[in-house]
Swiss-Prot record:
EC number: 1.2.1.71
UniProt-listed PROSITE patterns: ALDEHYDE_DEHYDR_CYS, ALDEHYDE_DEHYDR_GLU
Name of the gene this protein is made from: astD
Entry GO MF terms: succinylglutamate-semialdehyde dehydrogenase activity
The UniProt record lists the keyword Transferase: no
Catalyses which reaction(s): N-succinyl-L-glutamate 5-semialdehyde + NAD(+) + H2O = N-succinyl-L-glutamate + NADH + 2 H(+)
Species this protein is from: Aliivibrio fischeri (strain MJ11)
Family listed: Belongs to the aldehyde dehydrogenase family. AstD subfamily.
InterPro entries according to UniProt: Ald_DH/histidinol_DH, Ald_DH_C, Ald_DH_CS_CYS, Ald_DH_CS_GLU, Ald_DH_N, Aldehyde_DH_dom, SuccinylGlu_semiald_DH_AstD
Protein name (database record): N-succinylglutamate 5-semialdehyde dehydrogenase
Gene3D superfamilies: Aldehyde Dehydrogenase, Chain A, domain 1 (3.40.605.10), Aldehyde Dehydrogenase, Chain A, domain 2 (3.40.309.10)
Source organism phylogeny: Bacteria, Pseudomonadati, Pseudomonadota, Gammaproteobacteria, Vibrionales
């Protein structure tokens, strides 16, 4: 039983899919995907459940969500273990994901009250009222890199606002979503309020094409996001929120301060989660000269000693595997392409078996036309620069705009950087992957269109209803011109 539809666990009727553990290629989950008809059933179940769910007082919806939060706390280690087995991320890291799920629930409850409150005031003898109403049935597309945390950041705000949900997780992490859906079931969620459909592209297309959805919250690749954007073009009746990737720049000033602290910040920016975070640094801008040379030498020395291993290794790894062997091969092929364009290897990314890839660093300064691509893995491109203005200009030369960062102890450099850089998340002397759950997450350009995550997700899960109210109809002292009564 791999799908949760209308409160029942059912088997799929489509093609067989399976989840392979990327660090040993063992099958950890398998089942049949949902057919178009089953997706339609899930959407219909959500539509039917919406009628009563939206009427339920907020306090009742909150109570169910908070029971779910307690279940996540109680099962945090088992959730983390499943995520580690499916993604290959170190166990210590997946434990933080389970904790983040709970933290985002508290943020979402606060956001509901602060972003979508009930307000009323008097104006010119009228009562002006602002209410918020749920959109209806929300489709949620989850990514593989944070298969618990990121869908949770859409599902919880949607439910709190009174929407119902159909979740389609990544086909590479179906097990995680199944485990989490069973916790929602234990929390006492009414039948049909959340529905889970598993599958690959055809299942996703069926859900995105379903007439019964009112909105779609997507986290994933730019390519898939752009397909959805074109598909929804002209359909003003549905809300589409896209969180996609980035070709994120990190600029290191000559005034970078402590050498090892800077190197640590770069490593955390580029190689955390084996480079599989959408905010990871992809391009590193380093000043020409001796200070830049020393920085790169130290960075290479530290990076080549990064411990890469299985999630549960006795010697705790910093990095795990890529999500799949195909993803690992993509990084190695990207390295070859950059070399062919004139890139010089400072540290070669190597295959370590199964889906493991060691971190790589390539000097792309002499690449005449650097591809504007997101290499979703542990491959860092270095570009040398002469002035901060040049570095910022190069950093902005991308169709993306998710995250960017400056390492500098000079306040005037930061003032210049934050004024001229184009990105939605901009950090100073902190890793690019650092983001607050109660701040907007996203950026302009090909990185997405809205910021439907964490605190600001409330904005996209309800629409404002403005009312001008009176106890009874009135006749004004002076009628409008041309009227007689």
């Amino acid at each position: 039983m791999t799908h949760w539809i209308a409160g029942d666990w059912v088997s799929g009727e489509g093609e067989m899919i399976q989840s392979l553990s990327p660090y040993n290629s063992e099958v950890v989950w398998k089942g049949e995907s949902a057919t178009e008809a089953q997706v339609e059933s899930a959407v219909n179940a959500a539509r039917n459940a919406f009628i009563e769910w939206k009427k339920l007082p907020f306090e009742n919806r909150q109570a169910i969500v908070e029971r779910f939060a307690e279940l996540v706390k109680d099962n945090a280690d088992s959730i983390a273990e499943v995520i580690a087995k499916e993604t290959g991320k170190p166990f210590w890291e997946t434990k933080t994901e389970a904790g983040a799920m709970v933290g985002k629930i508290a943020i979402s409850i606060r956001a509901y009250h602060e972003r979508t409150p009930y307000k009323e005031r008097e104006a010119a003898g009228n009562k002006i009222v602002l209410r918020h109403r749920p959109l209806g049935v929300m489709a949620v597309f989850g990514p593989y890199n944070f298969p618990g945390h990121l869908p949770n950041g859409h599902i919880v705000p949607a439910l709190l606002a009174g929407n119902t949900v159909v979740l389609k997780p990544s086909e590479q992490t179906p097990w995680t979503s199944e485990v989490i859906m069973k916790l929602w079931q234990k929390a006492g969620l009414p039948k049909g309020v959340i529905n889970l459909v598993q599958g690959a592209r055809s299942t996703g297309e069926a859900l995105a094409n379903a007439k019964g959805i009112d909105g779609l919250l997507f986290t994933g690749s730019a390519n898939t996001g752009h397909i959805l954007h074109r598909q929804f073009a002209g359909d003003t009746g549905k809300m589409l929120a896209l969180e996609m990737g980035g070709n994120n720049p990190m600029v290191i000033s000559k005034a970078f301060g402590d050498l090892d602290a800077t190197v640590y910040t770069i490593v955390q920016s580029a190689f955390i989660s084996a480079g599989q975070r959408c905010t990871c640094a992809r391009r590193l801008y380093v000043p020409e000269g001796e200070k830049g040379d020393a920085l790169l030498a130290r960075l290479v020395d530290v990076t080549k000693n990064i411990h890469v291993d299985q999630p549960f290794s006795e010697t705790t790894p910093f990095m795990g595997s890529q999500i799949s062997i195909a993803a690992a091969e993509f990084i190695l092929n990207a390295q070859k392409k950059l070399q062919a364009l004139g890139g010089e290897l400072l540290l070669e990314a190597r295959s370590l078996g199964h889906a493991f890839v060691s971190p790589g660093i390539i000097d792309a300064t002499n690449v005449a036309e650097l591809p504007d691509e997101e290499y979703f893995g542990p491959l860092l491109q270095v570009i040398r620069y002469t002035t901060l203005a040049q570095a910022v200009e190069l950093a902005n030369d991308t169709r993306y705009g998710l995250s960017a960062g400056l390492v500098s102890t000079d306040d005037s450099e930061w003032d210049y950087f934050v004024e001229h850089i184009r990105a939605g998340i901009v950090n100073r002397n902190r890793q690019l992957t650092g983001a607050s759950g109660d701040a907007p997450f996203g950026g302009p350009g090909a990185s997405g269109n809205l910021k439907p995550s964490a605190y600001y997700a409330a904005d996209y899960c309800a629409y404002p209803m403005a009312s001008m109210e009176g106890d009874a109809c009135e006749i004004p002292e002076q009628l409008s011109p041309g009227l007689t009564l």
